[in-house]
């Protein structure tokens, strides 16, 4: 057994190093330390058998073999038939004879003796070997320090004074009370960031400052930062060195040093922390002070934003540039309804007036910025055209309107600025549907037309603000009762009873008389002849694209003649009792869009305008029996 083989073989670090340098075929090196220690640093090409209590108990009970404990990469060496030398090491064992019988290393050695012919223990363990031959050790690289502000301090017991800047030192109470050390470094100013640390006897009161705070999570260090920075700058102006210290030089004094770097070097709190940490790795401000450093960083950014341009005094807004004498004021775009009041106020404060009046008192910075922004507002011609292309909508309720003495020359294009419209023609039940009467905007409007109370008047032509959507409603009830129903067939639905005809059976005409559905080769278009067939017309009738020209009027006359035929030849519907009920409620809703027309043509150019327009419409005719 292994316990009978005494004394046990040993191997020193030099011999193991020579064997490892010999290349492949060397001894099997077993690391008996914990997995954490092995993973951090271990001998080159060694394998680990973790020294846990569970592994120790299972080895003692014989429930696990050495081959099962060794990593798969080195298992081939264990299972080899050729003789294999084994070297075992722990952390620092120098003499195997002093090992306890129940120790993990003793149990492991006894089990290895049963599997291998030559088992030796490394003298001095890994500590001796790594110090003599660090190049023959390997492991994962040391983890980088976390880059956050809350990284822990390194275990440096005593680092002494640390020079952060040529005139700034960081230290502890022990360093400050060492007069020789202070004199050697030429330090004559002391900033004490504690309540309990005494003042050095060799430092005068004028060169000593105390920040009475404790290192806990309730102290407020932020109010003292500016005073501390002024004290450090005072020492710098005197060409002297200053030391900032607390009890250990880790938390409170380090916070003040970080704040000084932030203020003087323009660094962020994170960068300033790393700057000081690189020079004194033991610093570790508590989270309370770290949070106050973040608040101090925000205050510095706010101060820099308020100061703005270095050439402009802080707190004094730069006055807006005033135009030269006799020079015209910059033209402002037409104010909208939302900015009219603001624009007027800005215009009153915009500098010298044309009469040479003195400028108004300086306005607050926000008002000056608003005035400059308003002066720079300009709308391009494309934006103006896009504004004019917005849809407008209005509705007309028409019973009948006819003015024989008034005859327009022809329908013309809409007024400038009045772009594509949404038209809705709606007549109540029992009223005749005819051509719409001129709108109040048209010069041919009938004088007897009376607007409905809810109609919104059109804004004056000179008004700069115009709503993109207009609503208009007209009621011609009185005109319908005073004027005859003649010449209203231009927009009447085909097949309806003509003027002056009694309603007979089958008053509704078949849909074959209706205008054809618009198609690519026969789209909707305007009909000038139909427009001239009635008085007081605002909108031209619509027909097929093949109809414009002289043929359009002849088609309408043929439809009039067809409607003039006796109605008794048609059967199917009972006769209407009264002329007032001949025409029933009909609705027509049309929506069309058209581009802006540069040259406003009249009369003969209407057909070309209709071809340029894109039209979509729907007609619904309801006959109530």
UniProtKB/Swiss-Prot annotation:
Disulfide bonds: none annotated. Residues 380-389, 555-570 have a biased composition (Basic and acidic residues). Abundant in brain, heart and skeletal muscle. GO terms for molecular function: MAP kinase tyrosine phosphatase activity; MAP kinase tyrosine/serine/threonine phosphatase activity; phosphatase activity; protein serine/threonine phosphatase activity; protein tyrosine/threonine phosphatase activity. Keywords: Cytoplasm, Hydrolase, Nucleus, Protein phosphatase. GO terms for biological process: dephosphorylation; negative regulation of MAPK cascade; signal transduction. It holds the Pfam family DSPc. GO terms for cellular component: cytoplasm; nucleus. Residues 23-138 form the Rhodanese domain. It is an enzyme of class 3 (hydrolase). Residues 160-302 form the Tyrosine-protein phosphatase domain. Residues 431-448 have a biased composition (Low complexity). Residues 306-586 are annotated as: Disordered. The keyword Nucleus applies. The active site is at 246 (phosphocysteine intermediate). It is found in: Cytoplasm; Nucleus. It comes from the Eukaryota. SMART domains: DSPc, RHOD. Its EC number is 3.1.3.16, 3.1.3.48. InterPro entries: Dual-sp_phosphatase_cat-dom (IPR000340), DUSP8_DSP (IPR048035), MKP (IPR008343), Prot-tyrosine_phosphatase-like (IPR029021), Rhodanese-like_dom (IPR001763), Rhodanese-like_dom_sf (IPR036873), Tyr_Pase_AS (IPR016130), Tyr_Pase_dom (IPR000387). PANTHER family: DUAL SPECIFICITY PROTEIN PHOSPHATASE, DUAL SPECIFICITY PROTEIN PHOSPHATASE 8. Monomer. Belongs to the protein-tyrosine phosphatase family. Non-receptor class dual specificity subfamily. This is Dual specificity protein phosphatase 8. It comes from Homo sapiens. The gene is DUSP8.
